[in-house]
């Protein structure tokens, strides 16, 4: 898998965590660096682990002979479906975001958000098993990219950038749809 695809995929799955970090960052009032690092770390770890789990599930199914004939369609549908859902969610979520008034990063809500934003990475990991992508490289890239973007997102949110979260999710969704289309297109040409 080309490096540019790895980076685009990583940015695509990190979009939800980035948007959540912006929202959470609006509530961080003290210990900004420490709390932003904790939040970004939680998101990064989840985004690194979930595609590995998804890849393991997908690998089992990818080895079944009847699925090999349609593996490119499965990867496309998973990526396009996740991307479309991200775009839908960006326009159909409540404006009332659950923020913490004290500015503290409470562990339980942060873990729940980490899990919720990484479900997409689980599905992407499943899709990547069908195209035999290098999951360790992808998982590390997804985790690191999510960590960095979440750190930036928390900082942006703290400094009044809450209005960018929804658009980040839309762009991430479009990237995933584009990558799914690229997998399908490459398979049909090759």
Swiss-Prot record:
It is found in: Cell membrane. Signal peptide: none annotated. It holds the Pfam family Mntp. The chain crosses the membrane at residues 37-57, 64-84, 111-131, 135-155, 164-184. GO terms for molecular function: manganese ion transmembrane transporter activity. It comes from the Bacteria. One of its GO terms (cellular component) is plasma membrane. It is a multi-pass membrane protein. Keywords: Cell membrane, Ion transport, Manganese, Membrane, Transmembrane, Transmembrane helix, Transport. Probably functions as a manganese efflux pump. Belongs to the MntP (TC 9.B.29) family. This is Putative manganese efflux pump MntP. It comes from Corynebacterium efficiens (strain DSM 44549 / YS-314 / AJ 12310 / JCM 11189 / NBRC 100395). The lineage of its organism: Bacteria, Bacillati, Actinomycetota, Actinomycetes, Mycobacteriales. The gene is mntP.
């Amino acid at each position: 898998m080309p490096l540019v695809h790895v980076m685009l995929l990583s940015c695509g799955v990190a979009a939800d965590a980035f948007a959540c970090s912006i929202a959470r960052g609006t509530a961080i009032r003290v210990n900004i660096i420490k709390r932003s690092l904790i939040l970004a770390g939680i998101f990064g770890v989840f985004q690194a682990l979930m595609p590995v789990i998804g890849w393991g599930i997908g690998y089992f199914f990818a080895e079944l002979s009847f699925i090999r004939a349609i593996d490119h369609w499965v990867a496309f549908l998973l990526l396009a479906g996740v991307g479309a859902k991200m775009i839908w969610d960006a326009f159909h979520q409540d404006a009332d975001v659950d923020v913490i008034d004290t500015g503290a990063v409470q562990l339980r809500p942060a873990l729940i958000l980490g899990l919720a934003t990484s479900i997409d990475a689980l599905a992407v990991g499943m899709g990547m098993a069908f195209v035999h992508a290098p999951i360790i490289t992808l998982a590390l890239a997804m985790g690191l990219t999510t960590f960095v973007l979440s750190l930036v997102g928390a900082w942006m949110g703290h400094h009044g950038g809450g209005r960018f979260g929804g658009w980040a999710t839309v762009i991430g969704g479009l990237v995933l749809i584009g990558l799914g289309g690229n997998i399908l297109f490459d398979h049909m040409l090759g």
